[in-house]
């Protein structure tokens, strides 16, 4: 009896194994390989490759033969062997661009423009630790004459926006578009996206995702074709979508140009390099890229976890791929589509972002363990807007409290910009110091007169910093600031302690945004053909004035060390423009409007409610309407976001006893 049971289970096990080998259970699993030193991450591998002996030698794609030459690039080169980090003073990446030999091409000019005025630029080769070579490639793939001080390519980066590999590179790193896997050196070379010729230099268009959830019934599927066109069908179609030898009818389909890619859920992209131009189209459209056995390196795969935004599939298993796409959970689809939009906006929407991402990866290699962690690269706002020089702890940034489960801080530092002393300044100090959340007060003395010998007695430390005449210096990251939260004020600001307390409590719920009392709004002026802005009381707003606003101190670091010098110069030349510039910066990071809280009394820069107001109101400072247009041109787009919401305390102006209200002074005239 026991022998019969053993025989039965042995036969059942053999039958089950036979079913698996014959493909009766077609769904395959994909897992991530363990991290290997010097290898790019984010590539799944298929567990059942050994079971598909008939596909072990895949046929060569004739389209790839002429595009994948095997080029000697110094295959033994690694980061430690071929790059001298000792030349980077203070471990800060500075680059010098060799002048292109011959006429400057359009691609070279766009690269040079993206680096102009950036924090990476150096004036001479002696000040740089990385020399940038922009090859003038011909049809044969030759780089042209090598620059002086080539030194075998050591500490050089050969950068090309197009997939045209060069020869005679020696120890130089190569950053090119869609490099083939057989010549790419992981951990040393860099993979760029294939950019169209009309790709914007700065800013760039936002993502085009219109519908987060797939259409009910059938999920739309787009298949990349030649010349940037797409075939549209559904996941219920046959498996002949990408099989060149299939003679069956692939089912109903429509063809669209890449510019009008509809709101498809999945975009099937063949593995040959001629299809790489479709990758960014899918990313911008919010269409999940399904890469069919790609033979090219995904862009920035060294730092971007593409498993959160794309699917790597085996083109030899069409039935299994379609079945897996049909069975994907809606929550997984939503997460993938949201990640495509973040990656597009953070790293790929402009030439400037692509070039700066390339350099930031090299900067991370120089820093080593002090560089950007994976969370910064793969979650908003992205590594380009999260500077590790600010802090090595994620808790010190305003963006990651939700992921880390930490709090933004329980106290603030008041920073008061003083152009002239007066009674209003002394009263403001007393009101701010009376807040239970105030930790310190810093006076930025900008007056030609000497500061007073005596200041009001306060329960918190008061520090005076002299000699800062530039308006942009009010946003300098002073080492005296001891808290993560800043209350930015002017000497003419008039706030009560209750107003300060309530605004700070609101900021604690929105630590990445600005919370202010006085607002402004931008608008498009059809008559002038440009942007305009106004301050005062309107039905919507997109800015808060920094004369009375809470924000995270990280924005001082970003303002000083990330913004191009040309933009800060605009603010210094036009003092009323500094508020606009700070709001541009925060809106670029958050993609959200600021928060407005109630303000109970008139401010010198605010517009009076009506002409019958009995209180004398000083003339508002004239606004330079050209400022906002110059800033929009510098950013490459208009980042400001409008809002019609103001946050008030509970019971604010409700017909109840004032004794029941927590912030009573907010309603006092």
From Swiss-Prot:
UniProt keyword annotation of Ligase present: no
Cellular localisation: Endoplasmic reticulum membrane
The organism's place on the tree of life at top rank: Eukaryota
UniProt keyword Ligase, yes or no: no
Pfam families xref list: Exostosin_GT47, Glyco_transf_64
Transmembrane segments: 9-29
EC numbers on record: 2.4.1.224
Role: Glycosyltransferase required for the biosynthesis of heparan-sulfate (HS). Transfers N-acetyl-alpha-D-glucosamine to the nascent HS chain (GlcNAcT-II activity). Appears to lack GlcNAcT I and GlcAT-II activities.
Protein name stated in the entry: Exostosin-like 1
Species assigned in the record: Mus musculus (Mouse)
Name of the gene: Extl1
């Amino acid at each position: 009896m026991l022998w019969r049971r053993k025989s039965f289970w042995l036969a059942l096990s053999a039958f089950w194994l036979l079913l698996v080998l014959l493909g009766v259970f077609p769904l395959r699993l994909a897992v991530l390989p363990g991290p290997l030193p010097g290898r790019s991450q984010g590539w799944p591998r298929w567990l059942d490759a050994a079971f598909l002996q008939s596909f072990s030698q895949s046929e060569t794609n004739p389209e790839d033969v002429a595009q994948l030459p095997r080029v000697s690039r110094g295959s033994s080169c690694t980061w430690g062997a071929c790059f001298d980090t000792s030349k980077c003073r203070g471990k800060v990446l500075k680059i010098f661009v060799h002048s292109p030999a011959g006429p400057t091409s359009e691609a070279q000019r766009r690269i040079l423009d993206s680096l102009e005025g950036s924090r990476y630029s150096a004036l001479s080769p002696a000040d740089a630790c990385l020399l940038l070579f922009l090859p003038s490639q011909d049809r044969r793939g030759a780089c042209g004459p090598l620059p002086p001080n080539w030194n075998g390519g050591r500490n050089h980066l050969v950068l090309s926006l197009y997939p045209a590999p060069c020869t005679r590179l020696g120890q130089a790193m190569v950053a090119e578009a869609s490099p083939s896997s057989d010549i790419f050196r992981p951990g040393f070379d860099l993979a760029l996206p294939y950019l169209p010729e009309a790709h914007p230099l700065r800013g760039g268009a936002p993502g085009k995702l219109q519908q987060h959830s797939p259409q009910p019934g059938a999920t739309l599927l787009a298949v990349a074709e030649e010349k940037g066109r797409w075939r549209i069908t559904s996941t219920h179609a046959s498996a002949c979508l990408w099989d060149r030898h299939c003679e069956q009818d692939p089912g109903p389909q429509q063809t669209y140009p890449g510019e009008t890619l509809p709101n498809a859920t999945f975009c099937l992209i063949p593995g040959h390099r001629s299809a790489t131009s479709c990758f960014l189209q899918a990313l911008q459209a919010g269409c999940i890229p399904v890469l069919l056995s790609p033979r090219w390196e995904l862009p920035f795969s060294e730092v971007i976890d593409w498993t959160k935004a794309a699917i790597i599939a085996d083109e030899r298993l069409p039935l299994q791929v379609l079945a897996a796409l049909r069975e994907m959970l809606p929550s997984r689809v939503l997460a993938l589509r949201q990640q495509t939009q973040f990656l597009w906006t953070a790293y790929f929407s402009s030439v400037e972002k692509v070039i700066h991402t390339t350099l930031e990866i090299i900067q991370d290699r120089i820093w080593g363990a002090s560089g950007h962690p994976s969370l910064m690269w793969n979650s908003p706002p992205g590594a380009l807007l999260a500077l590790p020089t600010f802090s090595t702890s994620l808790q010190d940034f305003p963006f990651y409290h939700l992921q880390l489960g930490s709090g933004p801080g329980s106290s603030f530092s008041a920073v008061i910009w003083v152009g002239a002393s007066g009674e209003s300044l002394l009263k403001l100090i007393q009101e701010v110091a009376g807040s239970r959340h105030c930790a310190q007060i810093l006076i930025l003395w900008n007056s030609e007169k000497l500061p007073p010998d005596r200041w009001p007695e306060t329960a918190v430390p008061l520090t005076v910093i002299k000699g800062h005449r530039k308006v942009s210096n009010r946003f300098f990251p002073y080492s005296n600031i001891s808290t993560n939260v800043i209350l930015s004020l002017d000497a003419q600001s008039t706030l009560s302690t209750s107003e300060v307390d309530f605004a700070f409590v609101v900021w604690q719920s929105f630590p990445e945004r600005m919370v202010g009392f006085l607002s402004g709004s931008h608008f498009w002026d059809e008559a002038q053909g440009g942007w305009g802005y106004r301050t005062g009381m309107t039905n919507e707003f997109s800015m808060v004035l920094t004369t009375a606003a809470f924000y995270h101190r990280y924005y001082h670091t970003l303002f000083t060390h990330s913004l191009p010098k040309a933009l800060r110069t605009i603010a210094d030349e036009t003092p009323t423009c500094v508020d606009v510039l700070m709001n541009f910066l925060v809106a670029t990071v958050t993609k959200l409007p600021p928060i407005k809280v109630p303000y109970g009394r008139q401010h010198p820069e605010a517009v009076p409610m009506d002409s019958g107001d009995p209180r004398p109101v000083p003339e508002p400072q004239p606004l330079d309407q050209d400022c906002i247009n110059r800033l929009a041109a510098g950013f490459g787009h208009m980042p400001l976001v409008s809002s019609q919401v103001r946050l008030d305390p509970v019971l604010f102006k409700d017909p109840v006893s004032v004794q029941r209200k927590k912030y009573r002074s907010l309603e006092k005239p």
